[in-house]
Amino acid sequence: MISEANQVNDDINHEFNFFDFIPVKISESLNLIFGKTIEDYHELSHPDDLKKHLDQFFENLSGNYPSKSKPYPIDYSIIGESGPFLYKLCKILKPELIVETGVAYGVSTSYILQALHENNRGKLISIDSIFRPWQTKEMIGSAIPKNLRDRWELKIGTSETVLENILKHTSPIDIFLHDS
């Protein structure tokens, strides 16, 4: 338990190495990737109901990090336009198989699953691990709406131990999201 407490302190005090990057808006990304503008995808809605669900989930999340009721820091979750970008990317590409590493509460997972649900096709396989005593399988993906889980398969373990088996036993992966 002491080593876990030390690890939490290390996590809290961890300094990130910042790197240069140029932020790109969704509209610019679509143009760079597909040669189209956002107006070409005007039929794509913004998943407002999903955003409301996720906002409500985080408002209702109780406890302090780290605890069984709040096993991940809130800033583990994607922010800004990342979720809507994943949603729109999946709506445009209509993938059959997506693999992601790292789920935590399941914000990016929810946006992907919303698109798959609306596409009425595709499957998401997610990999996440339980590496702290206060983390539980039940909290992994706990923000994901129940009605979106039918196209989701969660594999518990590290990417190093689980990913190779997924690659050997699945069809080609259309989108791979490494978020762990």
Features from the language model and the residues they span:
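Charged/polar, solvent-exposed surface patches and flexible loops
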Residues: 28, 32, 52, 56-59, ...
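A general marker of short, structured functional hotspots
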Residues: 12-17, 30, 37, 53-54, ...
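Intrinsically disordered, low-structural-confidence terminal and linker regions
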Residues: 1-8
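S-adenosylmethionine/decaboxylated-SAM
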Residues: 72-180
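Class I SAM-dependent transferase core
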Residues: 39-82, 88-93
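Active-site segment flanking the S-adenosylmethionine/decSAM binding pocket
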Residues: 11-36, 40, 44, 151-180
